[in-house]
Amino acid sequence: MNTLKFTKMHGLGNDFMVIDAVSQDFTPEDAPIAAWADRFRGVGFDQLLVVGRSETEGVDFRYRIFNADGSEVGQCGNGARCFARFVADKGLTDKKEICVETANGVIFPKLSDNGMVTVNMGKPRFMPSEIPFVPESGEGDDACIYGVHLESGIQPVSCVNMGNPHAVIVVDDVECAQVRETGSLIEPHRQFPERVNVGFMQIVSRTAIRLRVFERGVGETQACGTGACAAVVAGIRLGLLDEGKTVEVILPGGTLYIEWACGGDVMMTGPAETVFEGELAYS
């Protein structure tokens, strides 16, 4: 029986178990991820992040993400910031800006001296086939609003892919939003073949929103980086937020800063913090 070193990190309360697969042998497909994620009998986390070397020329690292239920996903914004902080703190790179390969493309995290991390999250995608989403109300491919057919009626959502699928719902007050009830109905809905993250967005001003997110395979979390990006993009497309301005996204775990100009890449800035270092038995 060998030991496996790991680091517990969080980005605004969205917490991660981070494993260095560059300096030690680790195969996530063989790991009991769901057991490790258990908050009473394991390490406890929303997602497992695996740091590996990329085989692609010009790319510094490969970034793999696994939900608490063991399912692999293509992107995680809060995780991307923790990933960048981890490789810098562990001396795996001396670069301030790194090139990181994910299952859904390349991202470019940049570390600031003040502890904040800015990540170029790439371009959002909107085509139903790119979400993926199956329209059932006759909407066109470029619609800003689609209908999700629930037993209680049709729920309007804005669909955005930020490396993973998001459905954004505009609400009057996030504190009163039925996040768990509605999120648990939409997350596995037949119109989202790969399931979906569900965001509940309250407009505070042209440059500020409040947001709660019911994450795919996890449930509601303290913060969701890609969810914050998706919400701001949706708000701009709906004419509710200012394009090209920095939008303050207030989540239960803290605040992120998102900027997007139509047709461009989405920029996300926020903190990443280490909680503790640990070891566990692993064979």
Curated annotation (Swiss-Prot):
Which positions are annotated as binding substrate? 14, 47, 67, 77-78, 164, 197, 215-216, 225-226
The disulfide bonds in this chain are: none
Any idea of its EC number? 5.1.1.7
One GO cellular component term of this record is: cytosol
Q: In which pathway does it act?
A: Amino-acid biosynthesis; L-lysine biosynthesis via DAP pathway; DL-2,6-diaminopimelate from LL-2,6-diaminopimelate: step 1/1
GO biological process, any: lysine biosynthetic process via diaminopimelate
Where is the site Could be important to modulate the pK values of the two catalytic cysteine residues?
Answer: 166, 215
UniProt keyword terms in alphabetical order: Amino-acid biosynthesis, Cytoplasm, Isomerase, Lysine biosynthesis
Whether Cytoplasm counts among this entry's keywords is: yes
Places the protein is found: Cytoplasm
> What's the superkingdom here?
Bacteria
Which PROSITE patterns would you find in this protein's record?
Answer: DAP_EPIMERASE
| Chief localization | cytoplasm
Q: Do you know which Pfam families this protein is assigned to?
A: DAP_epimerase
Q: Which residues does UniProt mark as catalytic?
A: 76 (proton donor), 224 (proton acceptor)
The reaction(s) annotated as catalysed by this protein in its Swiss-Prot or TrEMBL entry are: (2S,6S)-2,6-diaminopimelate = meso-2,6-diaminopimelate
- GO terms for MF: diaminopimelate epimerase activity
Quote the subunit structure annotation.
Homodimer.
Q: Which family does it belong to?
A: Belongs to the diaminopimelate epimerase family.
Could you tell me what this protein does? Answer: Catalyzes the stereoinversion of LL-2,6-diaminopimelate (L,L-DAP) to meso-diaminopimelate (meso-DAP), a precursor of L-lysine and an essential component of the bacterial peptidoglycan.
Per its record, how is this protein called by name?
Diaminopimelate epimerase
Q: Which organism is it from?
A: Neisseria meningitidis serogroup A / serotype 4A (strain DSM 15465 / Z2491)
